[in-house]
Each structure stands twice: as C-alpha cells, then as structure tokens.
Amino acid sequence: LSERWIFLDLDGPVLDVSARYHRVHQDVVQRHGGWPLPRAIYWEAKRNLVAETEILIRCGLSTEAAREAEAQRRLEIERPDHLKLDEPWPWMADVFDELLDLGRLGLVTLRQHRDRLDRQLNALGLHLFFREVVAGPGDGTPEAKAALLRRSGISWGPGSVLVGDTEVDVASGRALGLRTVALGCGIRTPALLAPWSPEALFEDLRQVPSWLEGGERT
C-alpha cells in the first residue's frame, strides 16, 4: 500500500534564501559599476516577480550590462560560498517533527549542482529528515519539476501533497495529481500565488501539519 508523501520545495518553504539572493545581487551590480538595492527592497521586487534585468537597470546598469549581469547571477547563485548564507527558518525542527507523524517527507528542488545540494543539506542537518531527495536542473517550468518526481520512482499514496512557494510548484503538483499548498514566506507574495488556486495558501510551513490533520478527520 502506497503511503502518504509530503513533498517540500527547499528554497523558500524550508530555507530563507533572501540573504544569498541579495549577496549575489550586490556582487554582480557592483562588478558592473551600479548601485545595489537594499536587501528588503530587492527581495520585495523578487517576490513581486519583477524581472531580474529590470531590477539591474534600476541599479544603473545599461541594458547590455544588465543582460551580462543576469547571466553571471545564474552562474553564481549556487556557488558554495553563497549557499552558506541560506538558513532554515527557526521553527523548522519542530515542524519537521510534526510532519513526520503525518507521512514520509520528500524534498523536491530544481538545482543545477546535486553535489553542492547534498553538502548543503548535510551541513544544515536537513538530510536526516527526508526519506528521498529529488533534485535536478530545470528550466523553471512546471513540466520540469513534475518530470523530476515522475522519474524518481516514488510511489505516493492518496492524500500526498506538494508544498512550495511559487506558481511552478502549484502547477507541477496539480499535474501530478497531488494536493497543493502554497506558502507566502518565499519568493512570491500571497497575492501572486492566490490566482493559481492552490488547495491551501499559508504564510509558512507551521500551518501545514494542522491542515493535514484536519484532512484526516474529514
């Protein structure tokens, strides 16, 4: 009998990645002679889906320099020294304990470098909580994320759920027949997530265990 799986996206739901994103922003903007945005302003722009090149132009870069800086940003966003800036949300250990009582935990993330991901998970002690880690490069589409899970060989049972912080997570979960939960603590605002009609929309993972338990009682 297939068990219930709770699949979590890493960046946003589990990790606060705003420091890493802002550090890379600072580096590439300064390299091209621009003026980086303050962290709060930069992160709010990212959460509101402002294009990276538009952000870079606001920082004083020419269109050509912005394109170059965006290419450099993509190369550097998973650099090991940058990944060290990521931090689990302070409540994660307690939430993991609650979730593990409700199903098997799987991590699903689009990352270009599996070796760097594994080192990061080990350094943060997160590898201990996940039965499976499903990761691979992607083009940022729901199809790419859904394909990762399809190829994983995991057989999930009724009530399994995908928890993420982007429209890609909601759409990929729906394509796989999973329940979908969107969280507003990551790289999208709740206002941008709501039109994608996730089954539930919460501020962060702390609300998910009670929601899953409520589903068990109905």
Positions of predicted regions on the chain:
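Short beta->alpha linker loops
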Residues: 87-91, 112, 165, 185-188, ...
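N-terminal helical cap/lid subdomain that shapes the substrate entry/recognition surface
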Residues: 2-90, 100
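Substrate-recognition "cap/lid" segment bordering the active-site pocket of phosphatases
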Residues: 110-161, 167-171, 175, 192
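Conserved H-loop
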Residues: 35, 127-131, 199-202
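Short, acidic loop-to-helix structural element flanking the phosphoryl-transfer center
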Residues: 80-107, 115-118, 143-146
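Conserved Rossmann-like nucleotide-cofactor binding loop
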Residues: 13, 20, 113, 168, ...
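Acidic, Mg2+-coordinating phosphoryl-transfer loop and its flanking beta/alpha structural elements
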Residues: 162-202
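Glycine-rich phosphate-binding loop signature in dinucleotide/nucleotide-binding domains
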Residues: 101-103, 154-159, 215
